[in-house]
Amino acid sequence: MDRATVSLIVLAAGQGTRMNSDLPKVLHPLGAAPMLHHALRAGQSLEPERVVVVAGHGAEAVAKAARAFDESIEVVVQAEQLGTAHAVAQAAPLLADAPGEAVVLYGDTPFIRPETLERMLDLRSRHAVVVLGFEATDPGRYGRLVTRGEELDRIVEWKDATDEERTISLCNSGVICAEAGLLLALVSEVGNANAAGEYYLTDVVALARVRGLSAGVAICDEAETLGVNTRAQLAEAEAEFQKRARAAALEDGVTLTAPDTVFFALDTFLGRDAIVGPNVVFGPGVTVESGAEIRAFCHLEGCHISRGATVGPFARLRPGAELAEDVHVGNFVEIKNAVLDEGVKVGHLTYLGDAHVGEHTNIGAGTVTCNYDGVMKHRTEIGAHAFIGSDTMLVAPVTVGARAMTASGSVITENVPAEALALGRARQVTKPGMATRLMEMFRAAKAAKKKEAP
């Protein structure tokens, strides 16, 4: 099937009152990304020609998050939440002439797999409407899928189901696909004569059957249909996401020495033969190339780590950190918006921000790039093969040339030419015997205070 003819409709209008939050439900973070992004990512696998997000509660924030994922996404607003069919109908003006298929997803159902959506589209060759269903361990209040042989006869919401229909374990996920024009036509015929007075998207199946059209069911694992309506379900979803991410990393040839203690983001990329130690947290935007090692208790976000580099333990890489091949970043080092060229060593207790460090330079313990003047950030440039002595303060903007050195304890406020040695500290003064005399003075003063005390 030509995937260019797929249109995606993502329903994201719900307020999520049970979340007890000012944040729209679909924007709660899951794997360090808005829950909405998970649904969009699954749908993106179909290479849709158009994507329409139906927003409602917090529409402006939802639209911003959707366009942060893909600027081409179109957003419509469902001012009143009158049901799922009503929500899909809001997309009709944008998709009235859309060719090909329409697939409806939900912003609060983050685990639908791309291969599941592919199977749904494959079933479209046999059925006019295809619904995604699952065998529920505890059917509860899910809508039931009533089938006749291999065909789907209708979907019955729990509130409207008979006692016999409630015994059915095949349940509705809400995900549906059909030819775009047909889906919108069926949606326009949906009424609200039901217990909730809502316009149910599920009614399109019965309406299709009235037209003599066939409906079918694609069945997926129940875990894919996990919806998030409460904080407890959000925690459950986070656990499921991390479980999947860890399994995928191991399958892709990554070593996780303590998998259950490593936490991934939605877009984390780890190359084959990368090694990740225990208690590592990946925030958004992290790429770790093949053969790199992240040691225990590191926190990384928005960074790129090249082959052969080692990070940690106890290191923090922030957005804009770029580590070239064979860079070593040791314990209690923080790097932000800084590029470290090949072979740079930053062993411990250092902050490098808004900086560029040339190849094979050594950064001594306690070095700080003083990049902020209270109003603006300034850059530090350090050349190749330089040696920055321990406890050096580099007051930006400042440049240290190639093969230059700074003496330990220096405060560098002026540029250092290539191959020069810079000393920016007071000269040491040594006074023989003064330590003993000072201690005697201090003890005498302390004794005098004790005598004066009442």
UniProtKB/Swiss-Prot annotation:
PROSITE patterns: HEXAPEP_TRANSFERASES
Keyword Nucleotidyltransferase assigned: yes
Catalyzed reactions per annotation: alpha-D-glucosamine 1-phosphate + acetyl-CoA = N-acetyl-alpha-D-glucosamine 1-phosphate + CoA + H(+); N-acetyl-alpha-D-glucosamine 1-phosphate + UTP + H(+) = UDP-N-acetyl-alpha-D-glucosamine + diphosphate
Main location, first listed in the record: cytoplasm
Residue span of region N-acetyltransferase: 253-454
HAMAP family, per the entry: GlmU (MF_01631)
Localization of this protein: Cytoplasm
Signal peptide residue numbers: none
Molecular function terms from GO: glucosamine-1-phosphate N-acetyltransferase activity; magnesium ion binding; UDP-N-acetylglucosamine diphosphorylase activity
Cofactor field: Mg(2+)
Record pathway: Nucleotide-sugar biosynthesis; UDP-N-acetyl-alpha-D-glucosamine biosynthesis; N-acetyl-alpha-D-glucosamine 1-phosphate from alpha-D-glucosamine 6-phosphate (route II): step 2/2; Nucleotide-sugar biosynthesis; UDP-N-acetyl-alpha-D-glucosamine biosynthesis; UDP-N-acetyl-alpha-D-glucosamine from N-acetyl-alpha-D-glucosamine 1-phosphate: step 1/1; Bacterial outer membrane biogenesis; LPS lipid A biosynthesis
Organism from which the protein derives: Cereibacter sphaeroides (strain ATCC 17023 / DSM 158 / JCM 6121 / CCUG 31486 / LMG 2827 / NBRC 12203 / NCIMB 8253 / ATH 2.4.1.) (Rhodobacter sphaeroides)
CDD domains the UniProt entry points to: GT2_GlmU_N_bac, LbH_GlmU_C
EC nos: 2.7.7.23, 2.3.1.157
Protein name, as recorded: Bifunctional protein GlmU
Organismal lineage: Bacteria, Pseudomonadati, Pseudomonadota, Alphaproteobacteria, Rhodobacterales
Protein origin, superkingdom: Bacteria
Gene name as annotated: glmU
Region (Pyrophosphorylase): 1-231
InterPro entries with a match to the protein in the record: Bifunctional_GlmU, GlmU-like, GlmU_C_LbH, Hexapep_transf_CS, MobA-like_NTP_Trfase, Nucleotide-diphossugar_trans, Trimer_LpxA-like_sf
Purpose: Catalyzes the last two sequential reactions in the de novo biosynthetic pathway for UDP-N-acetylglucosamine (UDP-GlcNAc). The C-terminal domain catalyzes the transfer of acetyl group from acetyl coenzyme A to glucosamine-1-phosphate (GlcN-1-P) to produce N-acetylglucosamine-1-phosphate (GlcNAc-1-P), which is converted into UDP-GlcNAc by the transfer of uridine 5-monophosphate (from uridine 5-triphosphate), a reaction catalyzed by the N-terminal domain.
GO cellular component: cytoplasm; membrane
UniProt GO BP: cell morphogenesis; cell wall organization; lipid A biosynthetic process; peptidoglycan biosynthetic process; regulation of cell shape; UDP-N-acetylglucosamine biosynthetic process
Region described as Linker: 232-252
Ligand binding (UDP-N-acetyl-alpha-D-glucosamine): 11-14, 25, 78, 83-84, 106-108, 143, 157, 172, 229, 318, 336, 351, 362
Active site: H348 (proton acceptor)
Binding, Mg(2+): D108, N229
